[in-house]
């Protein structure tokens, strides 16, 4: 049995295909199989598409710039894309009037791959995407994935067999903040002992069921909510600001508050303050200091 604390990491930007591979390999914890090349990532992404695993394409942002009205009209109606319109581009030292933020999945599912000819590096007029890696308990992950305008890839207890060598033949659990920060040493010792005993029992039963021939998707039913999971979440800054508004709030669970405030500091290099106001106005200025996009949002993900 392994006990760790939760953590969050703002992932570095990379190519579309490497973003897809990075997220997808989280599900099976197969990162070691990646050859870490652009060609390998492209082939991996093509296999995802061939097998219909489009959800992983959510993690590949695409930034476009164009003056074509027909392209604007398509993305303006697409609930998973954002469009920013500049009526007088010259006033902004720009050659384009439409700045579009979307993802690779939208292009693939709508047979619009040809629009990649309009792809540009992200500008201040785009609704910038960020990918984040959470290492947390299943309980906290359940709260994170309720933010449905983000795309997710999560470590799978169906396919990850924790009795295997690559997991050191053990189950990893997250130590809850309540156990870490109890008021007195005596209470902390008692609570910690009871917690670790419960986790040890769960691991024992899980490994025993695997040894008896059960598959991971069956044996996982005895694992508690404190079981460690890894989760990659990707989405535009507008979605992340909504995440911060809800998860940094005093009413949020203490453990997710800690993660959210840590992530906010990583994104903006300053501490979260309850005085920060986030809005969904189409003309708001984003936290990054750039002009945000006019966004068409939906309450459902693409898959």
Give short role names for the model-derived ranges.
Residues 1-303:
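Family-specific signature for flavin-dependent thymidylate synthase
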């Amino acid at each position: 049995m392994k006990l760790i604390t939760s953590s969050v990491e703002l992932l570095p930007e990379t190519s579309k295909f490497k973003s897809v591979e990075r997220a997808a390999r989280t599900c099976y914890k197969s990162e070691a199989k990646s050859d870490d090349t652009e060609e390998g990532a492209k082939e991996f992404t093509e296999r995802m598409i061939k097998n219909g695993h489009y959800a992983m394409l959510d993690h590949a942002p695409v930034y476009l710039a164009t003056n074509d009205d027909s392209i604007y009209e398509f993305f303006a109606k697409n609930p998973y894309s954002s469009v920013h319109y500049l009526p007088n581009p010259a006033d902004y030292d720009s050659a384009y009037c439409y700045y579009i933020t979307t993802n690779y999945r939208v292009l693939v599912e709508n047979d619009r791959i040809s629009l990649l000819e309009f792809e540009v590096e992200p500008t201040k007029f785009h609704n910038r995407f960020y990918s984040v890696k959470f290492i947390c308990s299943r309980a906290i992950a359940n709260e994170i994935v309720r933010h449905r305008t983000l795309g997710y890839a999560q470590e799978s207890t169906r396919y990850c067999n924790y009795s295997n060598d690559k997991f050191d033949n053990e189950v990893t659990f997250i130590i809850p903040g309540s156990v870490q920060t109890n008021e007195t040493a005596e209470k902390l010792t008692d609570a910690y002992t009871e917690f670790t005993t419960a986790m040890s029992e769960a691991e024992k039963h899980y490994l025993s069921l695997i040894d008896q021939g059960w598959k991971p998707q069956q044996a996982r039913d005895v694992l508690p909510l404190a079981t460690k999971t890894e989760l990659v979440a990707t989405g535009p800054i507008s979605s992340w600001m909504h995440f911060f508004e809800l998860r940094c709030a005093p009413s949020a669970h203490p453990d997710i508050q800690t993660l959210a405030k840590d992530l906010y500091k990583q994104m903006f290099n300053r501490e979260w303050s309850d005085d920060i106001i986030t809005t969904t106005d189409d003309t708001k200025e984003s936290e990054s200091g750039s002009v945000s996009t006019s966004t068409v949002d939906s309450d459902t993900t693409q898959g």
